[in-house]
């Protein structure tokens, strides 16, 4: 059997030429029954051992592809049964050949002139494994290359080293690889830039330095660069912003464009829609004409929708809108360039929304008392849109009314009444024969532009006109408009109408609006003054520590006179739970500490008063000894007790017996508990007439800076069912 196996394992020597000397050798430790001379006398056995070493060092073949058998080696039955992995069967066969002491004469004759280091069987196995799995052969031959006697690297190891050098991460990536977040190499130009055709611009990328690592000079340079970029951006925006001449020329271009038919292109329709809106903007900011009676070049943008008519004194809304060509009823004085959104469409949309929310509705202007000359003169009281995004009053319409304007019916009174709370402004009408409007800019001066008249305003003051014409009392002559405008800049007086031309039906409206604005401002100022005085009084008065022990003495007297002995014992037990901790925390406190705690308590009460005034829930705030300090108006309505009757008394005086007992037991349990300081339960309140009000309520225990229970906030809701 051993001779037959030797015949099967006898290799057929191929001709390799000069490549035979460059092939690395393999070796196995000798079997205990085989000596070194015996291995030299059996080349076939040594070739099988070399093949076994090669197979043992190579990874197993995948399950999907069966590894082929070496040449001249027939598969055994065990290998045929497991064709998906022929390595175990081949190994067993080679082990039998390796440690077999006999070999056939044919095998000895075939391998007589071949040295063990240059076995053709091992070379054929190597070639077959290389053809099957190149990656496996590379990993197999890479190991003996390092331990070979010649020391010459194989091509597979050279390719591996070159591949690993390509995948090696560079110390600093080039600019293009850094932007693309790809792995670069140390060569310049790098391989990726060469492939992409970017070899000329391949350079080391700049690493952004952290701000905390920058020096003072670098920080200053960075700040200057940011300022320069910001200035350049503003310059570009100002350069791209249309000038007043261009804005005035847009309506004429629009009229000429409307007269010629255009293609129904979506982009052209969108551009025309935007241009039409911008034309309305241009009309809103146009300056008044130089003539005393003539309207401004774009005054029709506002006045065409005005429901005034010279013949019948007024028209309906549909007719006014049809005469205007579908103009919107609100003010469209907006400029997209004032909003820095980076997109013209976004800025335009924001400007439109701001104008819709804050503009003036021209349909609110009355029609009584209008003269035929009103249609030919710009309307005073029409206000441009308020630029809320910029936080300033961008513009107030500087078109002065020459004749016949009703102050109460104008849009300015309505807008001033609407924005009186936020902008702290108002309007008034001075009984003077002429009218005018001051040009108001943004900033602090804009907030004081429209003021409520004081008693110092007399009828001796001369009117101020901003228009370039119509300076006399009748409005028919021409005056020095520029000098009067400069005088208007020095005075904060606004004249909105002529007493001889006012409509008597609108005088009460203007007077009521002015009185309401003035009273609201005065009330707000009084509240602020009282609030500041109360805060100052808290820190200025000689505050004494609050006598808390008297509160507990009053509690014992109250429950002894009202409740039975068992109920009194329940309250005493509740007090015994938390009073020792309370006394222990108060022991190290000095008198100054107690004064500080009392001032903090009084200052906190002021904040609770403000908070409760904003809430609609019946709320009461009391001390830890139940003295009521703050009462909400809703609690007074719920219990029918007045605020004066509640202040200074104890909260348990307005509860029934069971509610009082439950409150003290819950307070004793949660007074010094850190997990839960709020309790939700039910109670029953007592009205002055003795009726009971069942309520669901919650109380929260607040502590001071020394971790003492300082106050309790109670919220009550009546149970209606």
From Swiss-Prot:
**InterPro entries from the xrefs?**
ERT1_acuK_gluconeogen_tf, PAS, PAS-like_dom_sf, PAS_13, Zn2-C6_fun-type_DNA-bd_sf, Zn2Cys6_DnaBD
Which GO-annotated molecular functions does the record name?
Answer: DNA-binding transcription factor activity; DNA-binding transcription factor activity, RNA polymerase II-specific; RNA polymerase II transcription regulatory region sequence-specific DNA binding; zinc ion binding
Q: Sorted alphabetically, which Gene3D superfamilies does this protein's record hold?
A: PAS domain, Zn(2)-C6 fungal-type DNA-binding domain
Record-level GO BP terms: cellular response to starvation; gluconeogenesis
- Does DNA-binding appear among the keywords? yes
Supply the Pfam families for this chain: PAS_13 (PF24990), Zn_clus (PF00172)
Gly residues compositional bias, start-end: 470-482
Bias (Basic and acidic residues) ranges = 1-10, 221-230
Task: Give the keywords, sorted.
Answer: Activator, DNA-binding, Gluconeogenesis, Metal-binding, Nucleus, Transcription, Transcription regulation, Zinc
Q: Where is this region: Disordered?
A: 1-172, 196-331, 464-509
UniProt keyword Iron-sulfur, yes or no: no
Where is the protein localized? Nucleus
- Which segments constitute the PAS domain? 606-673
Q: Which residues bind DNA?
A: 174-202
Q: Which family does it belong to?
A: Belongs to the ERT1/acuK family.
Biological role? Transcription factor which regulates nonfermentable carbon utilization. Activator of gluconeogenetic genes.
Q: What is this protein called?
A: Transcription activator of gluconeogenesis ERT1
Q: Which organism is it from?
A: Mycosarcoma maydis
